[in-house]
Swiss-Prot record:
Gene that specifies this protein: ubl4aa
Taxonomy, superkingdom: Eukaryota
Protease among keywords: no
GO cellular component term, pick one: cytosol
Name of the molecule in the record: Ubiquitin-like protein 4A-A
Amino acid sequence: MILTVKPLQGKECNVQVTEDEKVSTVKELVSERLNIPANQQRLLYKGKALADEHRLSDYSIGPEAKLNLVVRPAGERSGVAGMASSSSAVSGVWQTLSTVLAKHFSPADAAKVQEQLVKDYERSLRQLSLDDIERLAGRLLHPDSEGMDTSYMD
């Protein structure tokens, strides 16, 4: 199938791929055509950022689809360093959850329940669109703004 990749500024290109290709492969093809290093690319489909390790079929990307390309500046990190502190907070949540589950389930059942919760959590995060993330960030950064429903955060 042929995908069209359109940078926010610049000329678009077409790439020939299969639906089983990984996003990282698409980035390599785009890198060859547009001279943009793969590590500086962020591909979006219908407002959702695509993860390198996932396949196009994971996002239901079909023939004639159009992907948007955001180019990161050369010196900018991919966000891994900035996520380290939030990552430790998340691991703290999973550790606390593990402790709570251990009080109510056998060790094997607690591990299964936690594994399923982690999978559900990660799936939910992958399904967030950029609009969803923007709304959530706005609500968290400006909780006192009028007209915003923040009751779900209680």
